[in-house]
Design a protein with these regions (language model features):
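Active-site-proximal beta-strand elements of phosphoester/diester hydrolases
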Residues: 3-6, 21-24, 107-113, 129-135, ...
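Pre-active-site segment of Zn-dependent metallo-hydrolases
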Residues: 13-52, 59-67, 136-181
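A general structural motif
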Residues: 18, 42-44, 70-72, 127, ...
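Active-site neighborhood of phospho(di)ester-bond hydrolases with catalytic His/Asp-centered motifs
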Residues: 22-26, 43-59, 75-80, 131-135, ...
């Protein structure tokens, strides 16, 4: 049994027969976390944070352990959170960077790369392989449509100079590294963020072109609306991939 519940933005709670996984918690408008954990108090809870950005990590997650004497929590965090001094070393059970692995008797975790901050996650649990992208995405896709995409430009929005072609190569390079580990996921959670502009589905499309995916779950669309995430559905249908509609 796998039960996936959307929390908010890039946050999800995944419950299996043996445990509960919580990814990139930011806020919980519907009270998902406490409701699900209270229903399954005997199951161990694994809490993941892929990087330090405030929409993927909040110190509130540490209060769950303090407030619950019945549940067993394991905190698995990206090392950039420690480097940015957003958390103390002793507050997490496991600190991970790209290429590191960790496992116990229930799950195996591999930290894969990101072309933004921190890591993405491969989690093997109860015979299933799960992928959470964190902030791994083709964020500069709209600039690839310009007359000179292979040229450094300045974005006031991002406040930096960048080369769209170089940035896309970084993203595709991370996908290549992930394929060295596995080319198949039962469940994939990936950014489909309309704020990127034209081509905002490109990163997710490039991913499903390279991997076997049992189900695609969009995320990181809070500011652009549920409808923007649905734009991925036709691309998934073309490939026979189930699409998880949120909203």
């Amino acid at each position: 049994m796998i039960r996936l519940t959307y929390i908010f933005h890039s946050g999800f709670l995944l419950e299996t027969d043996s445990c509960i996984l919580i990814f990139d918690y930011w806020m919980d408008p519907s009270g998902v976390v406490h409701r699900c954990i209270n229903r399954s108090k005997i199951k161990p809870v694994y809490v993941f944070a892929s990087h330090f950005h405030e929409d993927h990590f909040t110190r509130e997650i540490f209060t769950w352990k303090e407030d619950s004497l019945e549940s067993n929590y394991t905190y698995i965090l990206s090392k950039d959170i420690l480097k940015r001094r957003r958390a103390k070393k002793e507050e997490a059970d496991v600190w991970m960077a790209k290429g590191s692995t960790w496992e116990d008797e229930l799950i195996k975790v591999t930290a894969t790369g990101s072309n933004d901050s921190g890591v993405s996650w491969i989690v093997e649990v109860d015979g299933k392989c799960i992928f959470h992208a964190g902030d791994l995405c083709n964020w500069y896709a709209r600039f690839l449509e310009g007359p000179n995409p292979d040229q450094e430009i300045y974005s006031e929005e991002f406040g930096e100079h960048f080369n769209p072609v170089t940035e896309e190569k970084r993203f595709l390079g991370e996908l290549k590294d992930i394929r060295k580990i596995t080319d198949s996921f039962d469940l994939m959670m990936f950014p489909v963020d309309g704020r990127i502009g034209n081509g905002y589905t490109l990163g997710a499309r490039q991913f499903i072109d390279r991997f076997k995916v049992g189900m695609l779950v969009p995320m990181h669309f809070t500011m652009s609306g549920f409808e923007s995430a649905w734009r991925m559905q036709p691309f998934c249908q073309e490939k026979g991939i189930p699409f998880w509609c949120i909203g």
